Amino acid sequence: MDEAVSTTLEQLLNNTQLFLSYYNNKQKWTALYPMASKLAEQYRVLYSKQPFALQSRLTLYNPSYSYATNLVVSQSVITAALCKSQNYNSALSELYIAATLIEHLCVGAQLNKLCEQTPFQDSDKKIWKMRHQLAAKVMLASGDSAKPVTQLLAKLNKYKQALVSSPTIMLYDGGITLIALANIISMNITSNTANKHISLYKALTDLYIRTPNLFALQLIKSLIAHLGPLLPGSRVLYAEQTMIYLATDAQQRHVLISTANPNKLTWYRVKATLNDNPKQWHCTDKTISFKVFNSEHVKPQSELEIDKAQSLLELISNIKLQHEYSYKGLSLLMAPHPLVIANLCEAVKPYNKEHQPAKDLKHSLSMVGYYNAPAIIQRVVFEQLVNVTPHPLQAYVTNRLNGLVKIMALLVSKNDHDQFEHITLPLYAYAHFLLTQCGTQLSRKTLIDDTPNKTLSAPICSFFGVNAINTEQLTQQLTLLLSDNPWTAALLEAEQTPKKHLTEAHKLWITLKVVAQNVFKPELSLTPWQQQTLNEQLKILKWHNQADFYQQLESLELFNSI
């Protein structure tokens, strides 16, 4: 039998307070990162199953816990809500929630002083200034597994300041932006002794007006849409009584409780416009704080979530299985995917002398012909698959991927036998793998060592800031998606085949990476082997004038986006 929601919720809060207390016991430090990871998982899972119970932490301040604990709980809930509103996967969500839990680990005493408006001593000021470095040091006691979270903490203070600064300071890491946003909001909404805190909606409104950061603005809008107009735990005025709002049911009726009778709560379901006060308030009643969320009345609605990525993966599978590229067959398969059809109409423009888009699916197929259609259709579907896979660096990954695709298209543009859409399909599948399986490792860095590997070329993942990947898992996923594409095997083999044993098919991928290194990490000179491979392959690819190739490469206007 499942544990009662109230029990799970109370245990989560108790464990959060216990986690924060372990900082004072150095013998516990090695256990802190695994504990933070487990707590982050519990927050994510409970939020996905019982969002109202956790959202109520943003309005119900529990005096049984310290101010620091209430603050960390609020910030963890906001982080979980932000991740849910963006549809981030479990690994990414748990990393960000863990960073939120860890951020205040070393300054619990200082946070409580802030709440009481007690002046900081010099030692407090020093600890406060170094809080993120101290937290990172404690986490690294658990080993290298904590490195991703310490990298988030390293820039967190800078991001917090930049989110509310003018003039605009460019911020490039969406994950740190999300954590900083959750911090600013929680610091503003958590109840304090001076009663200077504000409601969540007021905090979001103020921040929306102040921040110049576009990603932060998008996060705020998504969070408001996700939470809705009323927060569980808010005090509302109904029938001339102050009641407590808990949830809204499938029929859009608000679930309220009245505490007018001290011996028994009275439950209401009403359809009305409510005047609410979502400002956090002290709640000492365990029934209101925890037990009401055991009720069937506040069960979250079972929403039918459409998994866009899964829908596209099924389309890829169906096209591959049926080998169906006739208009009649494709129109049936693609009918549920109007955006794919619209993108296909755009993708066929290079096959039109006037460079005009097609009018519809039938026109698209007639423009490109039966031979070219399969690769173009697959490319459009794979491109959309990457575009709908949520990640804070999704725009960057897409931009870098498009750069690699353009380079490959240019390399093979003089070859009449090989269609660039067919060759580049594995790149889209590779990018999708990175977004879904390496989401916590992705960064804007180009991780090619200054000291070249004498045996292997740098892997594709290094252009997306990922140092190493599970090659077995990568091979399995790419083969599953593109088993009928010979360039997939060539790409995978080129990542692991020693330089002495490379085939011509392998060397095409090596050439792509050499040119990409020139573009995205121009400060790193090519090795003699790279230069020789590039020269040989350009000739094979019918680029007899290298200056012509470089001139056309420059016209692509690729750049190393930060």
PLM regions: where:
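Short, solvent-exposed secondary-structure boundary/capping segments
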Residues: Q252-T259
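Generic N-terminal leader segments that precede the first folded domain
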Residues: M1-K126, K137, A141-K147, L491, ...
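Conserved alpha-helical "signature site"
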Residues: A31-P34, K38-Y67, N192-Y208, N213-M243, ...
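Glycine- and charge-enriched low-complexity intrinsically disordered segments
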Residues: A260-V298
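Metal-dependent phosphohydrolase cores
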Residues: V73-Q75, W128-A162, R400-K406, V466-S483, ...
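Buried hydrophobic packing segments
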Residues: Q75-C83, A135, M139, L181-I185, ...
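Solvent-exposed, amphipathic alpha-helical segments
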Residues: N15-Y22, L181-S191, L312-I319
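Metal-dependent catalytic cores of enzymes that make or break cyclic nucleotides
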Residues: N87-T100, H104-A225, P229-S234, Q241, ...
